[in-house]
């Protein structure tokens, strides 16, 4: 179902690439929907992710390893006032993990940002923009009173 939500953005990107000549040649691009890897029955059984409620915070995926927070801010700033832009990076290598977040000042600007950047190219990669979902707390983590136990159990 998540893939079905991205099909319009993917189709726009394929059309954009197919219409641009590469040197003296044309690049052949086709929409792969007719070559589906899942049967229609399997696709209908796939649980759908709930839609995120509109907010000023956007989740951006499909980023290049070269994309920086400043580059992300610049790309989205043409659609409204960007309060913050952050590319999530690996702690060890410092390279982008391929996703990030953009926070706009208003809901209207965030809607324009999604409409303007979803399925577009940034640093040579097709990116996807959608409203960010709040982080879910895992079931294993249960906050407890700090006085009940020490946080670590050493050799006793």
From Swiss-Prot:
SMART domains of this UniProt entry? RRM
Q: Extract one GO molecular function annotation from the record.
A: mRNA binding
Q: Which residues are recorded with the post-translational modification Phosphoserine?
A: 64
Matching Pfam families: RRM_1 (PF00076)
Identify the PROSITE patterns for this entry: RRM
Entry superkingdom:
Eukaryota
- Cellular location of this protein? Mitochondrion
Q: Which residues form the RRM domain?
A: 56-134
What GO cellular component term, any one, is given? Answer: mitochondrion
Region spans: Disordered: 137-156
Question: Which keywords fit this entry according to its UniProt record?
Answer: Mitochondrion, mRNA processing, Phosphoprotein, RNA-binding, Transit peptide
- Coiled coil (UniProt feature): none
Q: Entry's InterPro entries?
A: Nucleotide-bd_a/b_plait_sf, RBD_domain_sf, RRM_dom
Gene3D superfamilies the UniProt entry points to? 3.30.70.330
Instruction: Indicate where this protein is primarily found.
Output: mitochondrion
Q: Which GO terms describe its biological process?
A: mitochondrial mRNA modification; mRNA processing
Q: Where is the composition biased (Polar residues)?
A: 137-148
Presequence positions on this chain:
1-28
- Stated role: Involved in C-to-U editing of mitochondrial RNA. Functions as minor mitochondrial editing factor. Controls 6 percent of the mitochondrial editing sites.
The record's subunit annotation is: Interacts with RBG3/ORRM3. Binds to RBG2/ORRM5.
| UniProt-listed PANTHER family | NUCLEOLAR PROTEIN 8 (PTHR48029:SF1)
The protein, known as: Organelle RRM domain-containing protein 2, mitochondrial
The organism of origin for this protein = Arabidopsis thaliana (Mouse-ear cress)
Q: What is the lineage of its organism?
A: Eukaryota, Viridiplantae, Streptophyta, Embryophyta, Tracheophyta
């Amino acid at each position: 179902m998540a893939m079905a939500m991205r099909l319009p953005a993917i189709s726009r990107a394929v059309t954009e690439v197919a219409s641009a000549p590469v040197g003296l040649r044309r690049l052949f691009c086709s929409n792969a929907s007719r070559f589906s890897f899942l049967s229609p029955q399997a696709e209908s059984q796939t649980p759908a992710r709930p839609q995120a409620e509109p907010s000023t915070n956007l989740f951006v995926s499909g980023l290049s390893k070269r994309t920086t927070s400043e580059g992300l801010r610049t790309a989205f700033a043409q659609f409204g006032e960007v309060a913050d832009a952050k590319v999530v990076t690996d702690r060890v290598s410092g390279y982008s993990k391929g996703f990030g977040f953009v926070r706009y000042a208003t809901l209207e600007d965030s809607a324009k940002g999604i409409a303007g950047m979803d399925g577009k190219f940034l640093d040579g990669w097709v990116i996807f923009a959608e409203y960010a979902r709040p982080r879910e707390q895992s079931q294993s983590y249960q906050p407890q009173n700090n006085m009940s136990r020490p946080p670590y159990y050493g050799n006793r």
